[in-house]
């Protein structure tokens, strides 16, 4: 029993360094050069005195640990669908969001509004309002009955004197 050196049980409840179950690899009393631990290097083989031959598989498993990169990103995998719900972003939207200078239209105004006004999560900018001083007479957070929120420039224009 001195070959087991503190290991619990015999056979199927032992695992290798990657968490894979290791079958009983001990023959009679003699072992191959490996110190009697049953695990050699990657791709090595272990044969006991009983004539058993067990190859060690070369599988790379992480054992349930997720390895993450050191970089961080604040991009979300979903966005406002305009109807009070959320929808998943496609890969094109995710890529466009990460590219510098390539943000045109709604994504650009949404980021500008979120970054400069401290808006709430999921707040959506308004794309397509052009013209200066056209005004609709509404001084709240929405334009008419469309449910679309004001853009950053419209908020600034509203605060300027003589534009009403």
Swiss-Prot record:
GO terms for biological process: cold acclimation; response to abscisic acid; response to water deprivation. Residues 147-164 have a biased composition (Basic and acidic residues). InterPro entries: Dehydrin, Dehydrin_CS. Residues 105-115 have a biased composition (Low complexity). Induction: By abscisic acid (ABA) and water stress. It comes from the Eukaryota. Residues 42-51, 128-138 have a biased composition (Gly residues). Residues 42-164 are annotated as: Disordered. One of its GO terms (cellular component) is cytosol. Belongs to the plant dehydrin family. This is Dehydrin Rab16C. It comes from Oryza sativa subsp. indica (Rice). The gene is RAB16C.
């Amino acid at each position: 029993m001195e070959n087991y050196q503190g290991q619990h049980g015999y056979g199927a409840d032992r695992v290798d360094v990657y968490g894979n179950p290791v079958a009983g690899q001990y023959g009679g009393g003699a072992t191959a050069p490996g110190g009697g631990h049953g695990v050699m290097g990657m791709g090595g083989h272990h044969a006991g005195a009983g004539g058993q031959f067990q190859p060690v598989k070369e599988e790379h498993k992480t054992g349930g640990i997720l390895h993450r990169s050191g970089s961080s990103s604040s991009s979300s995998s979903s966005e406002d669908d305009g109807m009070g719900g959320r929808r998943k972003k496609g890969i094109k939207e995710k890529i466009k969001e990460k590219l510098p200078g390539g943000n045109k239209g709604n994504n650009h105004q949404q980021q500008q509004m979120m970054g400069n006004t401290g808006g709430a999560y999921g707040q959506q900018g308004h794309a397509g309002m052009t013209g200066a001083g056209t005004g609709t007479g509404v001084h709240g957070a929405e334009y008419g009955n469309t449910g679309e929120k004001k853009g950053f420039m419209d908020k600034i224009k509203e605060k300027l004197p003589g534009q009403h």
